[in-house]
Amino acid sequence: MQFESDFRFDMDDSFSMCSQTLPCPSAGSSFSSASSAYEPFTPTSRRSTPNELSLDFEGAYNPFATHHSELTSPSGHMSKYMFGGPVKGEPEHMSFNEALPTTPMKKLDGMVTPDYDHMLEMNLASRHSIGSITPSGSFPMYTISPTTMGPTSFMMTPTHSLSGSEIAESTSSWSCSNESPISFFPQRGLGPLELEGLDMDRHPQSPLGTYHLHAPPSPGRLRAHRKMMVHEIQRKTNELQRAQIRASRKVSGSKSDGGVDVVRRAMCKCDYPGCHKAFRRNEHLKRHKQTFHGEGPNRFSCEFCGKDQFNRQDNLNNHRKLHARPNSRNRGVEFIPAAVPIIEQEERSRKRRAPPKSKSADKRVDDY
């Protein structure tokens, strides 16, 4: 399909469009035109209506929205300037109902090479079959016909606002290599919400650079993590101490179960013939000899029962008191009623000798 037009459009940036050849495929992936302009133009995001072509420029340009024509495309233009996609025999109506943006793109150098044309073919063969000029969910690039451009090449891209989901969906079409056409343009219009939609981990060579989605931990989280680690260390330390205590108890219990021979462990043995007593301490052995074998001075005897096995006065007094108390099953000292008044009299006389605590305290206060 070919459309010859003699219209001329004068813009602020010296944009002209003379004797253009407009190949219009019905299911192609791009739109090509021939122009001698040095600045690109950008179509808006609208779908087209089939079977007719109307270009409407509502801005500072001359409208020719009522110009409709049946378009046919020669095979030469289709094979040379179109990027993939079958061509329907049925003509298609492409309409621009909204004003074209007047934002010019910067001149691109070094793009008219066979490698770049091949790269455009790969990038523009996306999964969306574009029936109109306006893309939906991808970034197709529209180039002007190289027959009238000479040694330079210009590109026009849609400038409508895209959401984060559309950007994330369209990034797959630009993942061929680091020579993607998006790398020739400065990225200025992407906000923080749209940057979050881009998966930069899958495309580390993108000109947008690697975007770290994980923020550094906050001081509050660091303090909580440190506190949790300290608590865990204390818990493990307490468990280790309890395990050591249980192990020591088990060892001591196993020793006690085997039984202990007191005589064999005692080092102080009685040397009297026929006596096999042994004691752990030397004073116990000495007392044994004084009590049972008559060693040492100051031997004391009980006048109630006649026992003389006491080498100390306090031991004798304790024994005599037991005679003044009634008998019990677990006591081996016999109760003697005559010992009761004697023991009571000794207790009363002992109390008289001891000064009262209150008087002694008063005397100490007076002395100070």
From Swiss-Prot:
InterPro entries, sorted: Znf_C2H2_sf (IPR036236), Znf_C2H2_type (IPR013087)
SUPFAM superfamilies: beta-beta-alpha zinc fingers
Disruption phenotype: Leads to immature conidiophores without phialides.
Comp. bias regions, Basic and acidic residues: 359-368
GO MF annotations, alphabetized: DNA-binding transcription factor activity, RNA polymerase II-specific; RNA polymerase II cis-regulatory region sequence-specific DNA binding; zinc ion binding
Locations listed in the record: Nucleus
GO biological process, one term: conidium formation
Family annotation (PROSITE patterns): ZINC_FINGER_C2H2_1 (PS00028), ZINC_FINGER_C2H2_2 (PS50157)
GO terms under cellular component: nucleus
Zinc finger (C2H2-type): 268-292, 300-323
Region listing for Disordered, in residue ranges: 338-368
Transcription regulation among keywords: yes
Induction of the gene: Expression remains constant during conidiation.
Keyword rRNA processing: no
Key words of the record: Activator, Conidiation, DNA-binding, Metal-binding, Nucleus, Repeat, Sporulation, Transcription, Transcription regulation, Zinc, Zinc-finger
PANTHER family, A to Z: KRUEPPEL-LIKE TRANSCRIPTION FACTOR, KRUPPEL-LIKE FACTOR 15
Entry comment, domain topic: Both zinc fingers are required to induce development.
Role summary: BrlA, abaA and wetA are pivotal regulators of conidiophore development and conidium maturation. They act individually and together to regulate their own expression and that of numerous other sporulation-specific genes. BrlA, abaA and wetA act together to positively regulate the expression of the Pks1 gene cluster that mediates the biosynthesis of an anthraquinone derivative pigment that contributes to conidial pigmentation that provides protection from UV radiation, heat and cold stress.
Protein name: C2H2 type master regulator of conidiophore development BrlA
Organism encoding this protein: Metarhizium robertsii (strain ARSEF 23 / ATCC MYA-3075)
